[in-house]
């Protein structure tokens, strides 16, 4: 039997797909955006999806839809919205309603009591307000929880990882926070890939260890057709939205 996951801020289901390849199964996913939910249904057929604002969704409802009780989930996974911590935004942190969604994530963890949780967010979370936001998040996530007469507490580990160091053709630094109620610190995996320069300097490195490139990932695709008028119009609309997004 596969280990059950509660997926929060699921987006298109990228984390879910990754964990499914590691032997886990998403029991319930929570996502507000209708387009993301439509994509989720394609990527995760048969998975129960709660479409709505997590501020208005109780942990009891999440567990009920996922057909679980507290202590039964193996994992809670997700990446709460990162705009309030992003170096590219106004960086309002926990003063931004979106920043407070991190606390909603922790609320679901504390009330569902999974064996472990994995949270992903932008690197900027580590230095917002001289690290006070991260300290507040870690303090809240590690506090003692009393359930059914027993006390539980999550042991936390965090690290800033770059996806390019693990075979992804993209420089993408993210903080990964892992907590477990077993009491053991999580050891993050060592990088599997290095820069071409490092590979050349180390005789024991092979070509498979070098950073992957975009060509490695999509070089075998057939040539793209000429864009249609519809595609060009949509592209212009998206560009205007990016310019005027207000962050």
Predicted segments — roles?
Residues 49-50, 114, 150, 227:
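Secondary-structure boundary/capping residues
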Residues 38, 60, 106-111, 146-152, ...:
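Short C-terminal domain-edge/linker segments immediately following a structured domain
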Residues 100-181:
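Conserved Class I SAM-dependent methyltransferase catalytic core
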Residues 56-59, 87, 96, 124-127, ...:
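Generic structural "secondary-structure junction" signal
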Residues 27-29, 76, 117, 159, ...:
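Generic beta-strand hydrophobic packing signal
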Residues 2-26, 71, 140-144, 170-247:
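S-adenosyl-L-methionine-dependent DNA methyltransferase catalytic core
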Residues 2-113, 123-136, 142:
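Core alpha/beta nucleotide-donor-binding catalytic domains of modification enzymes
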């Amino acid at each position: 039997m596969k280990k059950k996951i509660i997926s929060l801020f699921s987006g298109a289901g990228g984390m879910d797909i990754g964990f499914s390849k590691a032997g886990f199964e998403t029991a319930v996913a929570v996502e507000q955006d209708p387009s993301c939910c439509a994509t989720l249904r394609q990527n995760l057929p048969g998975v129960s999806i709660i479409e709505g604002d997590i501020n208005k969704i109780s942990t009891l409802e999440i567990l009920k839809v996922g057909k679980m009780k507290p202590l039964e989930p193996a994992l809670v996974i997700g990446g709460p919205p990162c705009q309030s911590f992003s170096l590219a935004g106004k960086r309002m942190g926990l003063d931004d309603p979106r920043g407070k969604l991190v606390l909603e994530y922790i609320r679901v963890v504390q009330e569902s009591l999974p064996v472990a949780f994995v949270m992903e967010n932008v690197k900027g979370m580590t230095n917002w307000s001289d690290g006070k936001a991260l300290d507040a998040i870690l303090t809240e996530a590690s506090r003692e929880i009393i359930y059914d007469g027993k006390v539980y507490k999550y042991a936390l580990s965090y690290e800033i990882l770059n996806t390019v160091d693990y075979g992804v053709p993209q420089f993408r630094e993210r903080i990964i926070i892992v907590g477990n109620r077993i009491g053991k610190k999580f050891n993050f995996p060592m990088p599997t890939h290095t820069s071409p320069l490092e590979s050349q300097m180390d005789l024991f490195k092979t070509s498979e260890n070098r950073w992957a490139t975009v060509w490695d990932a999509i070089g075998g695709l057939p040539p793209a057709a000429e864009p249609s008028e519809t595609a060009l119009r949509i592209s212009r609309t998206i560009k205007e939205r990016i310019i005027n997004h207000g962050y």
